[in-house]
Regions:
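Juxtamembrane/disordered regions of integral membrane proteins
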Residues: 1-133
Length: 133
């Protein structure tokens, strides 16, 4: 049997994870657009949203790994690929398409911060969820 530490993702798995990251980013961007005016700038609601992001990220990681047929021994790299894709798209949207998030600069900033928070959460959860040999 191959040592899990030596296993590499296939091209199909990598592409699947990148697509899942793009889907998650797009859903997050739409959630920001539709809801951020209700919580950006308010400490209590913002803290609640950040907590909900943690809760939502766990099943999102497991779903992405399931779709790509990846076991927990590769959770960290899976989280990194999905998150990296989402952050690349977020950076492009913030540079060239801020209106995706809304027209109010404070909402755009708060929404982008929530997406970056989600990316950090995903990376940490990927490390914590990875099954070690």
């Amino acid at each position: 049997m191959t040592d899990p530490a030596l296993r590499r993702l296939t091209t199909a798995q990598t592409v699947t994870l990148a697509v899942m990251g793009a889907i998650y980013w797009f859903v997050a961007a739409l959630v920001v657009r539709w809801t951020a005016a209700n919580w950006v700038g308010s400490d209590g609601p913002t803290a609640l949203v950040f907590a909900l992001i943690i809760v939502a990220t766990v099943p999102a990681l497991f779903l992405g790994m399931a779709v790509a047929h990846i076991d927990r021994d590769q959770a960290q790299i899976s989280a990194a690929i999905m998150t990296g894709t989402a952050l690349l798209l977020d950076g492009m949207a913030l540079t060239w398409g801020q209106s995706l998030y809304g027209s109010n600069p404070a909402i755009v900033l708060g929404g982008a911060a929530s997406i970056m928070w989600g990316a950090g959460v995903a990376i940490v959860l990927g490390m914590l969820l990875e099954r070690r040999a």
